[in-house]
Every structure is written in C-alpha cells, then in structure tokens.
Amino acid sequence: MCVPRPDSPSVFGSLLDRSAGHFRLSPHDRTVPAARRYLPGGLVLETTWQTDTGWMIVRDALVMAPWYDVEERSTTHRRTPSDWESEHMLLRTVRCVNGTVDLYVSCEPAFDYHRGRTEWSYTGKVYEEATAVCRNAPDEHPTLRMTTDLRLGIEDREVRARRRLHKGDTAFVALSWSDCPMPHTFDEAAVKMAATQDYWREWITTGRFPDHPWRTYLQSSALTLKGLTYSPTGALLAASTTSLPETPGGRRNWDYRYAWVRDSTFALWGLYTLGFDREADDFFSFILDVSRDADGMRYPLQVMYGVGGERELPESTLAHLSGYDGATPVRIGNDAYHQQQHDIWGTLLDSVYLHVKSRGHFPQTLLHTLRRQVEEAAANWRKPDRGIWEVRGEPQHFVSSKVMCWVALDRGAKLAELQGRPDYARKWAAIAEEIKADVLEHGVDERGVFTQRYGHPSLDASALLIPLLRFLPADDPRVRATVLAIADELTEDGLVLRYRVETTDDGLAGKEGSFTICSFWLVSALVEIGEVERAAALCQRLLDYASPLKLYAEEIDTETGRHLGNFPQAFTHLALINAVVHVIRAEREIGAGNFRPAHLGP
C-alpha cells in the first residue's frame, strides 16, 4: 500500500519483500482464508476465515464519505469535486459468526519502500490509539494514526493485538494518513463501512449495463477502473502495483503506477458506453491538461505521466528488496516516459474525436492542442520508434505506430471539418491517405497479412486494432486474413501473445505469458469480421480466467492459468469492456435478424 498517492513510496510492501511492511488481521493460526469476495456492487472486500474452533468474517475498505473539510479548498483537485471524497483511511472490521476464533493483528509499516525506520507511540492514555512516523524523515512521509477497540502492544516497529472472539463478538482497526475523524467504537466503524458500500452501490447504479450473464464482469471492470482513478486530476493508473513479474522469477518487472496516454481511447469508449460520462470527461480533461503548454513552456506529448501530471518519472531499482517470488529487479519510476512512441498522437486525437461525438460540441480551447498534435504526427510518421509495446531494443518502423499516425491525421481532418476549417481538413486527409498507402505497401506480406514492422514477416497483436480503428473496413480481405493469422499463429493454447520474443528485439531476455488485452482485442476483431460464435467462445474462456475477485493482471500463463504482471491492469479491463459489448451487441443483432458478417458484404 502506497500513501498518500498511489505512486507514493510504499508503507506496506510485503508483496515485494516479506520484510517491507505488512498489516495482518486474521486468526492466529491461519494464513489462507476460506473465501474472499467483493460485496456486490462495490469495492468492500469480504474475507471469510475458518479455524478448527470457529468462523469469522473480515471486511476491508478504503473509506468514502461526504466532504469533510468543507471550509478549506483542496490543493490537489483540478477536476470538479463530487459530493464524496476519500477519507484516506483503511478500515477493517471483524465479526465472529460461529464458535470461537483467536484474532491476531500485526501492523508493521515500512516507510519509503523499507528504507525508512518506523517509530510507534501511544496516543493519549489508552492502549487503543497509536501513531507511527518515519523516524529518519518524518516531514517527508505521512504520519499513520491507528484506532481500534483492541488493546495494542508496541514492539519496536510493530503494533500487535489479540483477542478471543466468541459468536457475535466484533472488533475493528482503522489506519489513517489524514486528519479526518477516526472511529473509536465498532458502531462508528460500522457506520463508515456501510456508508462506503452505499457510495459504491450508488455509483455503479448510474451506469448502463445489459441484462446478460456477463453483466457482472462489466460491472466489476467498471468498479476496477473507478478504483484505479486518481480523482483529484482524473488520471487513470495503468495498475496499482510495481514490479510484479511478467515471467515467474524473471526481469520483465515494471512500475505501472502512472497514467498512459495510450489508455485514453479505450477508456473513453468504455466509460461512455457504460454511462460513466463524468469519469470519462475527467480522464479526458487530464489528458488535455498534460498535452497543453505549461508555465510558458511548450512540452512535447509524452507516453505517460504521473497521476498529478508530472512529466519526469526517472527509473531506479530497489536492490534491498528481494522481489515478488524472487523476481528482480524491483523498479520504481519508468524510463518509458521519454521514449519516442508515435502512437500517442493518434490515441489523443481519437480521444478528442470520441469526446466530441459523445458530448456533441467542440470546445474552442481544443483547437490549438489539436493542431499541434496532428502536425507532430505528420512530421514524424516516417521515422522509426519504440512502438506500442515500449521495446527497449532499437527503434523500428512498427506498423501499429504508422496506423496510429494515420488515426491522428484522419481524426484531425474530421475534427477540422466540424470546426469549419476545410483547409486543414483537406491537408490532413491527404497526409492520412499518404500514410495509409505507405502502410499497405510496406506493412503487408505476400499473404495479405499485416506484419509487425516493415521488412519483417513477424506478426504483432496490435494489428487487431486495425478494424477497430477503422483503418480499413472489416470486410477488407487483408483485415480478415490478419485477424485469422493472429488467431492461428500468434497464440498459445488459444490465448494471444503480443509478439514472438524470439523474433522481436525488445531489449530483454526471457519469456512472457499471453497478453490478456490482446486476447480481448481478438474477441472484438473476430466480431468485426463476422466470426461471432468463435468470438463468444473465446470471450467466455477469457472470463473464466478471471481471478476470484474478477480481476485481471497483464498476462496469463496458458499452462497454469496463473496471472502474471502488474495487477489489476486497467488496459485489460478496458479491452474486456470493448470485447464483451462487441459480442453482446452482435448476438442481439443476430437474434433480431439485423447482423450481417462483414466478410459477406452489404
């Protein structure tokens, strides 16, 4: 857990090293629970524990509540504040539901990725309140406050508590890094827990979800995306973790606690489709914020940003941490922020186009930003780059990057037409046609299949976006050939790889699992070419791979079903929404007699 921001240094990091901080609340003699779930309609986690003598239920939540400090303006909010805010508090409640259970609590923060020294002290005259600070840098890290109805014992860097619970007994522990009022009784804790669940249920009710067996997966993905949103700015984190390995014990370990511009198109499409217009608008506003000039300086559009809009995200390693299951290095920061990736202009322009179509108007303030990004794409599309997968090998002429530059010019031309600027529209449309012709000449093999890069026959899953981005119509034989080639040749046990590591210079050693987002892209692409039954079967299989909490990491090991990489991953959940909606709409059109596979023509 990282506080006060999701990209701040961790205080509980046992996921990456058992000595890097923990907060355990469980039966004294158990480490594996009997069951775990989110309460329906929200992000309140419920864990059921069974012992030889009884059962108990633990509920965990990051507390949401109406605005607390109404007389002082927030210094972090750039988006319009809602009626609710986070109380910056982790609340844990316990209820024994059968027999007796010996409850055990252990909280040992390890500030600054276990580089700081923790010092606990009692607050006041009672055992039920304590405070933890980073002793060697107290002003640089938040103070942690704990309240509970258990008696706490301080043992060096750790506080502990224990109690024998009988059927009907309750307990709570709250940990805060803010000045919001904390609970001092179980009843007060229960009120906060109930209010938090009410908040989530009210929020999810504002969405639009089809009456379908897959509805719960859409709702879970929507909740996950909301949970990954940094509300003060609207930024959407790629994931909430760093350095969970893409290969067990391997070195493909990255920090994903940042916002990628690339996520914007799928984020807006998914959020608008499900009815979460406010969240879509907030993320769109964040993307516009970071793409504009600042402090009189003109900054180029970057691949990624900090959740507060920070431009510099220098990468370093934490050699003192052993890594998840021994996988090193543990990285913080991400050097991809200064890579040249030419798809970013297309994703930004596609986002603007989606926003304008959804909202029905084109804000005049967008025109300058729009023109800059279109001109950047026009000036750079002929150059090699690092590509959508942020390879750390040599820059290449990646087909997906050229396609996204086409998107930038195509959407720019359409938007210019809407703005009454036919001069720009004609100019940009002509360049878009030039890019398309170049891709069709150099990026398609003799089979009529789109390749990964110019001059090489390797396949790449990013080509599945070609029909989704309308680079070519879905009934074009090259689109169908590409989708089927990827489905047949770039899969392991039916799940899609992003590319073959043995034919792609990504600057790294080792294998990786199938990329779940790519498998969901295949679902959408199969629907586009009329293979609805095949798409539905693959979609159901992918949904079956979901974790017990309906969450997805970046990759799946096809041999074991194990999730690999950072978790949960926003891009995967965005692709899930796109795929599920594609299948549901196609099946309903077939049922109504309106669906015609693209390859059959009009």
Mark where each language-model region is:
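Acidic, mature catalytic/reactive cores of soluble proteins
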Residues: 1-602
